[in-house]
Regions:
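C-terminal nucleotide
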Residues: 1-127, 142-183
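Short beta-strand->loop micro-motif that forms the acidic, two-metal-ion catalytic signature
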Residues: 136-142
């Protein structure tokens, strides 16, 4: 398997986006929960612990906090899946992450949602999610190496047909980790 990065090529500006609003909403949630729990960050809560204090939050603030807490749990699960060599589980977690970013954190947009959905429909793709701050940018997809060429061709065409402009694709590979090369 390899990672395929797809740039939706939607122009975006984080300063003018709702990115800072999301950060503020998470800070509001943290302060409210700190009234009853001694935590420094939402990441310290398990999803079960969050459910016990969710009543303190309302509306979008609750959704934003739920995303942060469940995303942290997914990261922990992803590390365990990687240690087991369970790439299919990692793909499932990527999909869940994208759904949470779309439905709870609301930072995806039609272009990123389209790229991720098209990727998930392709044979050989185990999972796909947006990366970065959102409101434009890129997705990553876990794709079987033998399927990459067809994956890019199919997703590119379907994305162009749906959105009206092309995405850019980059096939990446995971090497042996960080190395030092003496020049």
């Amino acid at each position: 398997y390899c990672i395929v990065v797809a740039n939706c090529n939607k122009p975006h500006n984080l300063v003018e986006s709702k990115y800072n609003v999301r950060r503020h909403e998470v800070e509001v949630a943290l302060k409210k929960i700190q009234e009853v729990k001694k935590i420094n960050a939402l990441a310290e809560l398990t999803p079960e612990e969050f459910n016990e204090v969710k009543y303190l939050l309302s509306g979008v603030v609750a959704k934003r906090a739920e995303h942060v807490v469940t995303e942290c749990a997914r990261v922990t699960e992803a590390v365990a899946a990687l240690k087991r060599g369970d790439i299919a589980e990692l793909g499932r977690l990527l999909n869940e992450s994208h759904y949470s970013l779309r439905d709870l954190y609301e930072v995806t947009g039609k272009e990123l949602d389209m790229l991720s959905a098209l990727a998930r429909k392709e044979a050989g793709c185990l999972g796909s999610r947006m990366i970065g701050a959102g409101f434009g940018g890129c997705t990553i997809s876990i794709v079987k190496k033998s399927a990459v060429e067809g994956f890019i061709r199919h997703v590119d065409k379907a994305y162009f047909d749906a959105i009206g402009y092309r995405a850019s694709f980059y096939e990446t590979s995971i090497e042996d980790g960080v190395t030092v090369t003496k020049l």
